């Protein structure tokens, strides 16, 4: 089964342009499904993937308390896999065509207040004052994620040539291999120049290639390491929610809208394919307005 999963992984990467994060999640979902099938029928193969089995697997996941968003992703993983397997001749028919996608409950994303974002950035800047290469890199990670709102996978995928420091622009390769240009401000530029001048040269090795961000051993930075950096930096801010890079992306979008940015401009900056995804952030700003109103207005 692993050889089939390897071929499916190649399909996701080369033909569908899925990120490393999505591919890992999909393969993990499918391994969970295959383990479920083997528990029911030892030695089960792809022919064991029937609609009742798929429904039973999802029902077991739901009974175990799996979140709706995760169930929706697992359903998507299965539907993508079985459709691919039929096209490859690995399955005679697609059992997932009638498998319904659980409706994910749309919840407001956790975001930082502007003062909390400022405190997190100040903490990252303070840690970089001694010139330690990793501290300079960590400062750049936090500054650039908040300044641009790009995804952590997009940040870690940047090469040096993707950065126009003088014009303060990033050339970002997003989902579906769609390229967009994203601006950043002076604080992020300062963090970038410090990293390129003093941080990156100290970590670079023959294996670094053109990668902008590097790990401690000189290789391209893994998004999981960047997530750890963000969690630790934001976690040091009193009262701040526990967020990672995606939370900084949410925060950047929310603060742009609070500052009066046009919704379609924010959509372009974030690389959303539809405006509906970006509109979720308008609910965050409305929720904040209502909270302030309820607290401050005498007739609330």
From Swiss-Prot:
Q: Which Pfam families match?
A: Phage_int_SAM_1, Phage_integrase
Q: Does the keyword DNA-binding apply?
A: yes
* Cystine crosslinks: none
Question: Which locations, inside or outside the cell, does it occupy?
Answer: Cytoplasm
CDD domains according to UniProt = INT_XerDC_C
- Outline the extent of the Tyr recombinase domain: 107-294
Q: Please report the stretch or stretches of sequence annotated as the Core-binding (CB) domain.
A: 1-86
**PROSITE patterns attached to this UniProt entry:** CB, TYR_RECOMBINASE
Q: Give the GO terms filed under biological process for this record.
A: cell division; chromosome segregation; DNA transposition
Report TM segments. none
The main location is cytoplasm
Task: List the active-site residues.
Answer: 151, 175, 246, 249, 272, 281 (o-(3'-phospho-dna)-tyrosine intermediate)
For this chain, one GO molecular function annotation is: DNA binding
- Keyword Membrane appears in the UniProt entry: no
Would you tell me the Gene Ontology cellular component terms?
cytoplasm
Q: Which UniProt keywords apply?
A: Cell cycle, Cell division, Chromosome partition, Cytoplasm, DNA integration, DNA recombination, DNA-binding
What superkingdom heads the lineage?
Answer: Bacteria
The entry assigns this protein to a family as follows:
Belongs to the 'phage' integrase family. XerC subfamily.
The record describes the protein's role as: Site-specific tyrosine recombinase, which acts by catalyzing the cutting and rejoining of the recombining DNA molecules. The XerC-XerD complex is essential to convert dimers of the bacterial chromosome into monomers to permit their segregation at cell division. It also contributes to the segregational stability of plasmids.
Q: How does it assemble?
A: Forms a cyclic heterotetrameric complex composed of two molecules of XerC and two molecules of XerD.
- Name the UniProt record assigns to this protein: Tyrosine recombinase XerC
**Source species of the chain:** Mycobacterium sp. (strain KMS)
